[in-house]
């Protein structure tokens, strides 16, 4: 089987380009918005989008084709403290379309991860309403980029709080999920966390609702609900993606020494070799986000450690898993 089936990616910020003031999370404070007007917010979004384009071009030139877009790219969208917060992204549609076209033509996978305020299991109706708005905003950006679940694009969300009763909260989560518009439901992907919802809490929900499950290996490792990643369990996880004809997505990091449990490491020096066996074992491709502070530096470090670089006739770089790793068995 072709071993060019594992891709590595990173989230939100390019640490190299950040040194040149290229980043996508500019957010003017409310006082500035009120004094300079809402056009200033739109100018900020344009700057964020242009820098997103630069990051994707950087990724392409370095053979990185998996990236999570920052949720901070559209500041104050839906912020109830601002009178004009109901703006939409249509003012930037041409730039967004250009970015998406470039990314799709070059085979990039783009995803997003709405923040902790998305709580579909909340017992507060206003929190749920705002969660719907937040999810719609994220879905709209992906759609304007030309991406959908058919491109394996997803909106990663956590189970959220337990509100004193995990079982009841999960039932509320499922009920509210079913109320979401179809376009959003198609993008939702559940991820385990290290505190409230482990793999066995969320995987059955995913299987019931036909939602892909994003395995966060690090969260499981440091969780009080930690479980062994057996072949049987991995098959269940992979199947939540395969039945949707989507490429499985996982997250990996390490614990940063001296910080709170669950704090992502600054860098990564090695990957678990069992990950390299997944494509052959389950006949699937696999994309892995490295959730680390040095971002693309760890991605490239791991690519050069475990993969061979291949340059096509058109000058595009691709990373092929080294035979030393691709041939290893269980």
Curated annotation (Swiss-Prot):
Main location (coarse class): virion
Single Gene Ontology MF annotation: endonuclease activity
GO terms classed as biological process: nucleotide-excision repair; response to UV
Cellular location(s): Virion
EC number assigned by the record: 3.-.-.-
Intrachain S-S bonds: none
Record key words, sorted: DNA damage, DNA excision, DNA repair, Endonuclease, Hydrolase, Nuclease, Virion
Gene Ontology cellular-component terms listed: virion component
Classification via PANTHER family: UV-DAMAGE ENDONUCLEASE
Family label: Belongs to the uve1/UvsE family.
Protein name: Putative UV-damage endonuclease
Organism: Acanthamoeba polyphaga mimivirus
